Amino acid sequence: MKSKVDKPVTNGAPNATKTKAKEDRKRAKTQKSEADSQIPAKILKKSKKEKPAETEEKENTASNANLKVSQINKAVFVVFKKMQGSQLTKKMINSLITLLRDDTNAEQRTATTGYVLKRLIRSTGADDMKTVSLAASYIHCILNAVPAIDAFEVLETLKRDLAVGSQQRGKEDSLAAVGQLVTAFCILQTPQFAKAEPKLVTAVFQILAAQLKGREYLVSLCGDILAVSFKQLPAAIFEEYVWPLLQPELNKPLSGLKVNTCDVLLAVHLTFSSVLGRENILASLWPKKPVYTQLFDLYFSGSTIHSDGVYARLASFLVNGGKDMLAAWQQYIDSKQPLKLNAAKACAIQVLSHVLLNFKPREEQLILDIFTPTCVQFLLHECSSVKWDKGEGKKPSLKKLKEICFKFEGSLVLCYEKQFQNDDNKLHLLLKLLEHTLQLDSVISLPRFCQKLINQLSVESLHKLYDYYNNKLYSLEDEDRVSRVHCLNQMQLILNHSKLSQTAKWRQKQLNYLLLAGLFHLDASKKPCEAAQASAFSRQCAARCEEIFLGSLLHKCSGLPGLCQLLQKTLSYLNKELGQPDAESKLRSPRDESLQKAWKQVEKLLERPSKESDVVGQSFEALILFVSLALCTKIPPSITVLEDLIICRKNALQKSKEQVNEELKWQDVLTDALLQLLLQTGHFWREFVQLVATALIPHLEHGNLEQVLEVLNMNKNPLSKKSDGEEESDDELDKEESLKDSSDDSEDEDEDEEEDEGEDDAESHLAQIRESVRQALVNDGDADDDGASSVDWNDVDEEQGERLNAALERSFQMFRPKSRKAQEKERPTKSERIDSTNLLHFRIRALDLLELFITKKPTQSVILDVLHCVFQVYSHCAADSKLQSLREASLKLLKKILARNIELKENQSTAPILEAIEQLMSSGEEHSEEDQENGKQPASRQAKRDIIIWRDRCFAYLVSQASADGEPKKSAVWPLLVEFLELWVAKRRSRLSLASFEALFQSGQWQGVAPLAVVLASHLDVQKTRSFRRAQILKLLSEQGRRLEVAFKDNNSSSKKFEKQIARYVNQLETKASSSKELNLLLKILAQGGEKWQKLREQIQLVAKDLQPNKKVAKQKKQAAAKPMVVEDEEST
């Protein structure tokens, strides 16, 4: 964009000169000089018709003498060329600053600096906002980073090259005025201006003050700059040098001011109260009597949304005005409702936001008075409008209003956190908002807004707010179920608040009420009643009360003793209510005879609770009480669970071992009960089982762990209602059907794959049908006979005919296209989807029990069995998108297992660990790493790759655990490791991979890195090991250089053996052919050895040099062999 602000005149020049200059400027042609060829905003060249005398006079001035092309550093043109048309980067600006600051030639530096500033200052007057901002950022950086620049010279350049007429006429003067303001603002931020020299202050503020009478956007920009600059000046300097310059435009009645000039006046008052006190400003605005509505009208009029600072200064003025001014503001806002202009709405909301952030503690009640019902309605309506307005093509004013509403919400939260001191005022303001909109978060964009306000309340206020929501449950209209549920959710939030954890008595009272509301029908007086007399709240929200009660009962429970104590109090209260007349008829789910019979045992348990020292007794007590409580709910568990727990408790607490039933131990029944409880819906069951199981795990046996592991057997469905025999027979039938389906088309797998992809044509499909019919017609003994495809029906008896008929029917049915109904039948039904979801959640919860086992009993058998099971679960879920939650849970537990050490007993054999390693490594498929490098990988790459990665990590973990106590080479796992390594080296296809040994190197706990490196180096044999395996070994050793260096420092003997093997390998390479890749990897390893391997490194370098000519010769021979032979045509000769 071309800039049209190149003026040969300055302020104060005669009018005739200005007129002539403008005419010349209009006639001037845009020609580029060598120096000005790369400016961001192109500068017009001087008119050729300018008088020679004027030219000579201007060339003799000092400022223009510095801009001669011959004196300018030519490197600056390169920098400007890079800047043009590219985004501003730190590297660009640093290159320009370095050029201006580090030039040792003073004359050249001065000329270059002047030229740079001239170009950039002219660019600030461009008719393009992006160009102006870019040039201003460069000027700001240069003035702050180059100390040799004089601010007065910048001002002179500004007045000369970006002059503005005394009367701003036309677009050129307006653009030049913007450039002057921007450049002046850059000077205000320089270290030189920070010294506050009177001469510089006067010069800069003369430029700023001159724009207070310009166009509206210039006055707005100038006002913002002035308000910021006041904070940099001492009061004395401002009063003597700046205030006289501003008074002509500011010292006027309110009727003579605009919003921006009034804003500058408020900024002077707020910054320099000693210069312009409150009485002085009031007298200036209203010579007779203050009329605050005139001030408010000034800010509300117009359609422009001003900058945030304008509203912040008005808010500070209101706060300082005390009760009268805030009351006048509140009345004015209410009287203007409803506001129609977005600018007026923005003003009201922005000012209120800043009032909330700046009021004084003694004015809390005044702030509360501002939030009248009318004001609250206006604020929440605007917040709701911007939240639910999802339109993309919005007006700029709507976008600004949306940001302002966001700021208001944040200001209110900050006010609660930092400003409000009186807790009653916090609660009062929150209740005002809730009275208008009960579901406050539905109209507020800030996430968890209501929760943030509630978190700032004290314990007493939380109790009051809880009562407010509780009373709302009965005062709402009968049909308003949504609001009642919301109130219950808020009550749950308050009930589980961390501040109320110490108020046990109040919390127990609320839990008792929720228990009553969840299990009984309640009337309008909150008393148990018959179903016919139940209130609307009881009919609509009893189920939700039940959920909240059970969830809150276990919230942040301190442990098993605390849980038992809480259940004792709760069950005692429930038992008391059940003892009332006709209590059974008032229950939402009346108890059956079996539960009433078992309830007598519960009453006995309440009379004689277990001691805290008796962990098993308390565990059973918690289980029995909680299950009996859950049996009274609408969705109870099976009554057999309670009966089994009562019998188990009796057996577990028997002192005589002879009376214990050896066939079925109480631990087995208890484990089954825990698993059955995990099947129940409701997150509280998972939390409850974890609480109880944490205390019981040390008392369980390995057989109980196997019960949990059986749930995670991915080949069986633990929720299946069929018996094992039925499942096996079903599996056999499925296998037979699959074999039967695949027998007809197994001859041509490629055609089948094409058919699956929808690429088979009708002809191939017909051939398949024909072959299927032929197979159906042949006799058992004629399968290989070529003539068996024909049948003589005269020789066919009735039995054989029925067989052929059935075979033909199966053949045609097999290839019959499936209808839409048949395809829909193949999709899982709703019940099947629910069952699969329940099974998924059940298995995830079962993983919690496994985590408790490895935490409480990290024995060898426990860790190995859990590790194998969890890895199998992960492997099964890795590629199944429907099991991703189970995959993540199993992977999370797998990481925890690998972080724990196995606790071995004294002289305990590590043979099970070796078996686990062999079982783990045999689980993978044989694969070729050479095929993988050549791109011949299977289709499901990522899932298999992830499985192999975690298998290798498990392998490294087991190896380190098997050799944790002694020297690795003397451990039982070392021979197995060497055997694995030999198999990997010898075989092309192997279950092991390079990553398996890499995982061993990366295992921080294992001490066998040094001897393993020696074994790997021993396989660097040109005669015995393939080149691909040698390259893999070299790659591994080169990548683990630092780890090897540390390992060899602690093991000197292994270090010497390793050097010996490497030296042997180097000697082999001198006589045997090798690849360049091999040599490069070997050089990398030798480079890590320093001076001691210098000789070996030189040997390899010679081998590498000899290899280059041989490669060229081989390449030439290969190219020659590939050339086609020219055979002469004998006939032509």
Swiss-Prot record:
It comes from the Eukaryota. Keywords: Cytoplasm, Nucleus, Ribosome biogenesis. Pfam families: DNA_pol_phi (PF04931). One of its GO terms (molecular function) is sequence-specific DNA binding. Transmembrane segments: none annotated. It is found in: Cytoplasm; Nucleus; Nucleus, Nucleolus. Residues 1-62, 718-764, 924-943, 1111-1133 are annotated as: Disordered. Coiled coil: none annotated. GO terms for cellular component: cytoplasm; nucleolus. Interacts with nclb. This is Myb-binding protein 1A. The gene is Mybbp1A.
